[in-house]
Amino acid sequence: MDGPRSDMGRSDVSRSDMSRSDMGRSDMGRSDVGRCGGGPLQPSATPSPEPEPEPEPEPDRGSRSRGGRGRSFWARCCGCCSCRNAADDDWGREPSDSRDRGSSSRGGRPDSRGGGVNAAGDGTIREGMLVVTGVDLLSSRSDQNRREHHTDEFEYEELIVRRGQPFHLVLFLSRPYESSDRIALELQIGNNPEVGKGTHVIIPVGKGNSGGWKAQVTKASGQTLNLRVHSPASAIIGKFQFTVRTRTEAGEFQLPFDPRNEIYILFNPWCPEDIVYVDHEDWRQDYVLNESGRIYYGTEAQIGERTWNYGQFDHGVLDACLYILDRRGMPYGGRGDPVSVSRVISAMVNSLDDNGVLIGNWSGDYSRGTNPSAWVGSVEILLSYLRTGYSVPYGQCWVFAGVTTTVLRCLGLATRTVTNFNSAHDTDTSLTMDIYFDENMKPLEHLNRDSVWNFHVWNDCWMKRPDLPSGFDGWQVVDATPQETSSGIFCCGPCSVESVKNGLVYMKYDTPFIFAEVNSDKVYWQRQDDGSFKIVYVEEKAIGTLIVTKAVRSHMREDITHIYKHPEGSDAERKAVETAAAHGSKPNVYDSRDSAEDVAMQVEAQDAVMGQDLTVSVVLTNRSSSRRTVKLHLYLSVTFYTGVTGSIFKESKKEVVLAAGSSDSVVMPVAYKEYRPHLVDQGAMLLNVSGHVKESGQVLAKQHTFRVRTPDLSLTLLGAAVVGQECEVQIVFRNPLPITLTNVVFRLEGSGLQRPKILNVGDIGGNETVTLRQTFVPVRPGPRQLIASLDSPQLSQVHGVIQVDVAPASGGRGFLHAGGDSYSGETIPMTSRGEA
């Protein structure tokens, strides 16, 4: 395996170059690397670097003239409503300006243009003109604006506010303000700002404009003017350039643009008029402001959890989020709509179609990038994408979901990360999971295009849906993992959870696919002597068996299955399934079901850590009043968590005689040496059990997935944590395997504590225990989480976390600047080694 890359380098897998601004493009063919049907698609070859698009030239808006006098845009607009003035109301020409007003900071910032301009554009300041000598946007993290707008945790010095809520600023003038003076604030975004599209905002002080913006004087004292500015709850989100214009009888003055005066505007879940409004403060604290969370994985019976550093307030992350919208070519005028924004994000977090953030890889070969299990957060991924412009290798569902949570929370949408256990992937829109067997009930893998993932991770975000009938507001599913196309591109959602719950698969967006993931049935088909297939068993409670997320204001797991589906087996749940299936490609699938099921079967697997032997058992129960003879076939194989299976490495055939009302078990022992050569990611195995009851003809069928667990890292804080002071953490790991782990890499990350750091530690011997220590300097106070992971070719999915309560620096809150990108990889010697 190649050494880890600190900057994640360039994408190693080819993608079709389809960066278009519209959402409806044709579906391009995709390779299906490392898996057979029913799984996420991924690219397959090394790309040539994608050149950065050339910026479109901005039209010269100062070139028009009438009667020898140029006309500025602002001068052509009425001060009270921004409508066009009459042709005679010409106060002068705006100087030509071709600066870029893109929303992200990936490129260089424009320079200030000097000392201001008058109406004639010659820089002459005449007596009586009102000159703005300076602006204070009160943008410090400790200032009123940032605190009131809940943006004080952003590691930025610029002003960051939320729409629909007033903010304050101060103008410094060349003379005292007079009531006859006319002042207008201007905000511009994009390369070609237009008033009609909301990308050029003119706000006359003391009056509102037709777009809902207002600016009022709150205090005039000497040569200082305090203003309160109110944005509409539907304002475009992004980074705006801010300038000021004044008009007096002596002439017009324009303050030159200063990069320090850029203003970021975000969605506002605290504003009742904003369609992203959330009416629960606890939810806002957790789903918008919480910088870390839990992501669940594994199987329903063996749930694992990992802490993820969302890091939405880290320096550079906000610019990365806005760069994603820019890279997609999303029109600025549509960036005030959270439905459109979240749909674009679901397309752009994966690299297919658009050269987005992450390259998906389910092949098991990650030598040209980072194993998805090695990531501990989103910050390193997003900063690499912002810095290089290239897709980052590699991601799987929990990585796509973790990054999506970061992006949507950063932009102001209440978002949570959701795990669905036994998640179906319906490839033929039948809204059922179809599994095919031969005459002896051995799986026909070449026909099993549908798959059931052990788990799948996606996102819920909260918003109203004005594009749907009433009753579908609230949680909306957004899934950035590239599985199937939607309108020709790899995106999914937003989809109302309420429509999923009731099987209303005709509601947009992508409801049929999401419904099948959580509430379809497993249908078992057996090949008959004439080659046709017959339904022999329908498993109604096998899909979407548990849907969970991190609980609000807690590290506990919350079961949210009930918001996605009615109680399993209830009349409402059956109606939802059959309503949805009626709109699928096999609407009559439930018409040919057989009954007479008096033998029940249950499968259990022993909980074991990787490196240990284990057993699986099948429990049969005869619920009839007569004897039953059951012929059982057990097939054991390894499986990717996406439901794609490897070859069968162990099988067993048994005949079991059950007395009336009795139970019996069939046990299959599995030694470490038997499963170790076959293991793939996540350490999961699949037991296919099929059987035939001699007396009644009943067919038994069951698929049971289980996994061997991986060990955790142990983190210990050595001393107190204070802003600006060096702190030390100790990491201890014991290798559970009898083999050497080679090219071991640790990752360390924590918002407000540690920028993403990569540590190369070499090899770790079989059953060896190692200890290493690392120092870090906290930059923000409060409760924080430091997260670590370990990865090697022989062992992955190893991680740990520690809570760090950071005290403020003496004398204040003690924020420190935390700029800079990820650390490059370093070779770290272990402080101690020992045999376990």
Curated annotation (Swiss-Prot):
Palmitoylated. Inhibited by retinoic acid, but phorbol ester treatment activates it. Its cofactor is Ca(2+). It is found in: Membrane. One of its GO terms (cellular component) is membrane. Its main location: membrane. The lineage of its organism: Eukaryota, Metazoa, Chordata, Craniata, Vertebrata. The keyword Lipoprotein applies. Residues 1-33, 89-112 have a biased composition (Basic and acidic residues). This is Protein-glutamine gamma-glutamyltransferase K. Residues 1-68, 89-125 are annotated as: Disordered. It catalyses: L-glutaminyl-[protein] + L-lysyl-[protein] = [protein]-L-lysyl-N(6)-5-L-glutamyl-[protein] + NH4(+). Catalyzes the cross-linking of proteins and the conjugation of polyamines to proteins. Responsible for cross-linking epidermal proteins during formation of the stratum corneum. Involved in cell proliferation. Its EC number is 2.3.2.13. The modification Phosphoserine is found at residues 48, 98, 112, 824. Disulfide bonds: none annotated. One of its GO terms (molecular function) is protein-glutamine gamma-glutamyltransferase activity. It comes from the Eukaryota. The gene is TGM1.
